[in-house]
Amino acid sequence: MVSRGPDEWLETIKKCQALTENEMKQLCEMVKELLMEESNIQPVQTPVTVCGDIHGQFHDLLELFRTAGGFPDDINYIFLGDYVDRGYYSLETFTLLMCLKVKYPAKITLVRGNHESRQITQVYGFYEECLNKYGSTTVWKYCCQVFDFLTLAAIIDGKILCVHGGLSPEIRMLDQIRVLSRAQEVPHEGGFSDLLWSDPDNVEAWQVSPRGAGWLFGSKVAREFNHVNGLNLIARAHQLVMEGFKYHFPEKDVVTVWSAPNYCYRCGNVASVMKVDEDLEPTFKIFSAVPDDYIRESTANHNNQRAGYFL
């Protein structure tokens, strides 16, 4: 058989067809090498499109690209993590994003979410999906090695911090993120974990999160963090927003971007991407779920019993 390369892999995965185990090994090695060169806070220039959780909703990811204006050959993208779990095409979703990273390394930034974790993916679907599709856990292990090298944050023109979850009482300055050791499984607590797990909420300062990891943080915390670090905005994902995006706090200095429409194929929400031009004024493009026969068939054929953690 003639060996195929990244261009052929991309054309295959665009059709929602999985790569071979050996191709996945090669792809993951290529992506790891690219990610090793990136900093914990990857600088990105405008114009850029920021995308929230995808959660294995492959056909909706294709709709996201259509909504945003195309693949990264023309547009800079930042994805805020949670590529896998819950949806039925986590493997194909993450494979597509990795193929795009290889083809357009400077045009797409992949931030780590709390689901890019060995522990979480063994509970919420990605581990089981890889086992079912390949007959072994080998490809899952390759992908988990990539997870360990995903960047923790991105910063747009030095003014908009992009992170999966939120802030940490252990992190006051951006430089404290830059010196974290990220090439590891997500810790159970501490600054690294908090970046992936925390949520903005109507609390005075800090409050223990009901998720069991990370913190709830209030408007005063966000305002002080942005002031100290010269930021205009924190863009994050991590929480389902029925309207696709949501500004938090009176200052509108934290925004949630959610990019998985009709989440879990049943929530009925719309999704959004956040476009940021040179003026640093965000605008949002809303899109709905694709009424896809593949998804309906998969939904009917899958056991939808998952553990209780939902958002």
From Swiss-Prot:
Belongs to the PPP phosphatase family. PP-6 (PP-V) subfamily. It catalyses: O-phospho-L-seryl-[protein] + H2O = L-seryl-[protein] + phosphate; O-phospho-L-threonyl-[protein] + H2O = L-threonyl-[protein] + phosphate. The gene is SIT4. SUPFAM superfamilies: Metallo-dependent phosphatases (SSF56300). SMART domains: PP2Ac. Keywords: Cell cycle, Cell division, Cytoplasm, Hydrolase, Manganese, Metal-binding, Mitosis, Protein phosphatase. It comes from Saccharomyces cerevisiae (strain ATCC 204508 / S288c) (Baker's yeast). The active site is at H115. Mn(2+) 1 binds at D53, H55, D82. Mn(2+) 2 binds at D82, N114, H164, H238. PROSITE patterns: SER_THR_PHOSPHATASE (PS00125). CDD domains: MPP_PP2A_PP4_PP6. This is Serine/threonine-protein phosphatase PP1-1. GO terms for molecular function: metal ion binding; protein serine/threonine phosphatase activity.
